[in-house]
From Swiss-Prot:
GO terms for biological process: chaperone cofactor-dependent protein refolding. It comes from the Bacteria. Together with the chaperonin GroEL, plays an essential role in assisting protein folding. The GroEL-GroES system forms a nano-cage that allows encapsulation of the non-native substrate proteins and provides a physical environment optimized to promote and accelerate protein folding. GroES binds to the apical surface of the GroEL ring, thereby capping the opening of the GroEL channel. The lineage of its organism: Bacteria, Pseudomonadati, Verrucomicrobiota, Opitutia, Opitutales. The keyword Chaperone applies. It holds the Pfam family Cpn10. It comes from Opitutus terrae (strain DSM 11246 / JCM 15787 / PB90-1). PANTHER family: 10 KDA HEAT SHOCK PROTEIN, 20 KDA CHAPERONIN, CHLOROPLASTIC. This is Co-chaperonin GroES. It is found in: Cytoplasm. Heptamer of 7 subunits arranged in a ring. Interacts with the chaperonin GroEL. Belongs to the GroES chaperonin family.
Amino acid sequence: MANVKIKPIGDRVLVQHIEEKEQVRGGIIIPDSAKEKPQEAKVIALGTGKKGEDGKVTPFEVKVGDRVLISKYGGTEVKLDEKKYTLVREDDILGVIE
């Protein structure tokens, strides 16, 4: 796990964006911010898990190190040491990239 100074709580997951640059014919680079698609990210840290009505904690389906897809506008963005992270609920993770 990366040495990050943010510890998620509950069912939250800390992810770090994986920046992709797409170069099209003619040498124009299209940044991710101009693309309308889910964002690829790496799971950096996990909270304690989602607590059900019965008080039991449901384990996460993702693990630290997983590459995941998150909604472009989901979660809360955080900048720490010049790196961009997002805190999302596990339910906001669209899928795991295998």
